[in-house]
């Protein structure tokens, strides 16, 4: 009985230590989530403005007849996917949702291998490479609040691959942050630049402007910048969803640990009560034997 009590007590202490760790990790993830939400909000100011300008320009007569490859759809022989996952686990179903969505896409549309994956995050890169899938570029070790400088190379590389016709359309697959408890898988087309919402055009417009030095050079600068801002926005959004998933996973782990501790405490008290009862019974029996 003493051994049983000691064993239960050891489990309680071990679970308490685990609870302290997961509780601390929950607080860290919550702090990261707050910073990421603010970063995403700040970036939207820039992203909204460049989208307004691009939308208004594309709706104007200034781009009629443009042969810019980022605007013109071409026969799709190969599709590129930027897939955003985390570098580490302990984020609940965050990675599994994205990986399942990608596997479903490939099974439905790319059984002949006409796809290329640009993996952001070690979990996704390892997953695809372990299955012999076509990973053409990867980025690991993304910061908690990634700067454009950190991801600029892989973004520019993705756009350049499209312009060089290594693939004929480009999508980004990521978890969109809804709130601290919810995220949604998004597969969003980046290239060619799809039809834009006319309601988002800048109020002042650009139709009355003269483009210097010329239209094609303006588009050559603006369209990559616009596409890169969309991709970077998706990365920031995905990172926010990752922190939310981590916070929720650690909160669930902490709650589960507390439930285990409560159950073990009840089990310990019952075992201790049984041991005390047995000791009393043995003492009484011994006293009776002496009479």
From Swiss-Prot:
<dbReference type="GO" id="GO:0045259">
    <property type="term" value="C:proton-transporting ATP synthase complex"/>
</dbReference>
<keyword id="KW-1003">Cell membrane</keyword>
<comment type="function">
    <text>Produces ATP from ADP in the presence of a proton gradient across the membrane. The gamma chain is believed to be important in regulating ATPase activity and the flow of protons through the CF(0) complex.</text>
</comment>
<dbReference type="Pfam" id="PF00231">
    <property type="entry name" value="ATP-synt"/>
</dbReference>
<keyword id="KW-0375">Hydrogen ion transport</keyword>
<keyword id="KW-0813">Transport</keyword>
<dbReference type="GO" id="GO:0042777">
    <property type="term" value="P:proton motive force-driven plasma membrane ATP synthesis"/>
</dbReference>
<keyword id="KW-0066">ATP synthesis</keyword>
<comment type="subunit">
    <text>F-type ATPases have 2 components, CF(1) - the catalytic core - and CF(0) - the membrane proton channel. CF(1) has five subunits: alpha(3), beta(3), gamma(1), delta(1), epsilon(1). CF(0) has three main subunits: a, b and c.</text>
</comment>
<dbReference type="GO" id="GO:0046933">
    <property type="term" value="F:proton-transporting ATP synthase activity, rotational mechanism"/>
</dbReference>
<dbReference type="GO" id="GO:0005524">
    <property type="term" value="F:ATP binding"/>
</dbReference>
<keyword id="KW-0472">Membrane</keyword>
<protein>
    <recommendedName>
        <fullName>ATP synthase gamma chain</fullName>
    </recommendedName>
</protein>
<dbReference type="InterPro" id="IPR000131">
    <property type="entry name" value="ATP_synth_F1_gsu"/>
</dbReference>
<comment type="similarity">
    <text>Belongs to the ATPase gamma chain family.</text>
</comment>
<dbReference type="GO" id="GO:0005886">
    <property type="term" value="C:plasma membrane"/>
</dbReference>
<keyword id="KW-0406">Ion transport</keyword>
<dbReference type="InterPro" id="IPR023632">
    <property type="entry name" value="ATP_synth_F1_gsu_CS"/>
</dbReference>
<keyword id="KW-0139">CF(1)</keyword>
<dbReference type="InterPro" id="IPR035968">
    <property type="entry name" value="ATP_synth_F1_ATPase_gsu"/>
</dbReference>
């Amino acid at each position: 009985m003493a051994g049983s009590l000691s064993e239960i007590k050891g489990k309680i202490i071990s679970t308490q230590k685990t609870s302290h760790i997961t509780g601390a990790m929950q607080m860290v993830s919550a702090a990261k989530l707050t910073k990421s939400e603010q970063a995403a909000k700040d970036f939207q100011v820039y992203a909204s403005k460049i989208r307004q300008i691009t939308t208004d320009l594309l709706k104007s007569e200034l781009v009629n007849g443009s042969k810019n490859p980022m605007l013109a759809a071409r026969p799709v022989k190969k599709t590129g996917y930027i897939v955003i996952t985390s570098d580490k686990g302990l984020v609940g179903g965050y990675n599994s949702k994205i990986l399942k969505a990608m596997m479903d896409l490939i099974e439905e549309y790319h059984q002949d291998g006409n796809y290329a994956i640009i993996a952001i995050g070690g979990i996704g890169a390892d997953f695809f490479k372990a299955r012999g899938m076509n990973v053409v570029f990867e980025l690991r070790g993304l910061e908690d609040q990634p700067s454009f400088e950190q991801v600029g190379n892989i973004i520019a590389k993705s756009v350049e691959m499209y312009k060089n016709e290594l693939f004929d359309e480009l999508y980004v697959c990521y978890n969109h942050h809804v709130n601290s408890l919810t995220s949604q898988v998004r597969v969003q087309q980046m290239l060619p630049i799809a039809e834009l919402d006319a309601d988002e055009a800048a109020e002042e417009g650009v139709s009355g402007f003269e483009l210097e030095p010329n239209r094609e050079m303006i588009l050559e600068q603006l369209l990559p910048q616009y596409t890169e801002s969309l991709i970077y926005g998706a990365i920031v959004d995905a990172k926010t969803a990752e922190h939310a998933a981590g916070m929720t996973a650690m909160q669930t782990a902490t709650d589960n640990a507390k439930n285990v501790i409560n159950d073990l405490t009840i089990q310990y008290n019952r075992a201790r009560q049984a041991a005390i009862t047995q000791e009393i019974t043995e003492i009484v029996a011994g006293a009776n034997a002496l009479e």
